[in-house]
């Protein structure tokens, strides 16, 4: 029982250290990639607006020609 507690404590300790290292790396990556994320988000918004505009034009054309 005592050895099991020691091994569980060791696993918990190592997991905590590894988690904190991952969080530090992620934080550094996020700082570098903020501009890149913003660009990707802007492009995805523009693509969505483009699709919306195409649908609007198609619907307007359909209503105008009465071929719906």
From Swiss-Prot:
GO BP: defense response to Gram-negative bacterium; defense response to Gram-positive bacterium
Propeptide segment residues: 23-39
Cellular compartments per GO CC: extracellular region
Disulfide bridges in this chain: 62-68
Domain of life from the UniProt record: Eukaryota
Keywords, in A-Z order: Amphibian defense peptide, Antibiotic, Antimicrobial, Cleavage on pair of basic residues, Disulfide bond, Secreted, Signal
Family, similarity comment: Belongs to the frog skin active peptide (FSAP) family. Brevinin subfamily.
Function: Antimicrobial peptide.
Name of the protein described by the UniProt record: Palustrin-1c
UniProt source species: Odorrana versabilis (Chinese bamboo leaf odorous frog)
């Amino acid at each position: 029982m005592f050895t099991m507690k020691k091994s569980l404590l060791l696993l918990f300790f190592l997991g905590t250290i590894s988690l904190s290292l991952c969080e530090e790396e992620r934080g550094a990556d996020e700082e570098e990639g903020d501009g890149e994320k913003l660009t990707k988000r802007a492009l995805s918004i523009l693509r969505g607006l483009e699709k919306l505009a195409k649908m609007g034009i198609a619907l307007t054309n359909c209503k105008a020609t009465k071929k719906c």
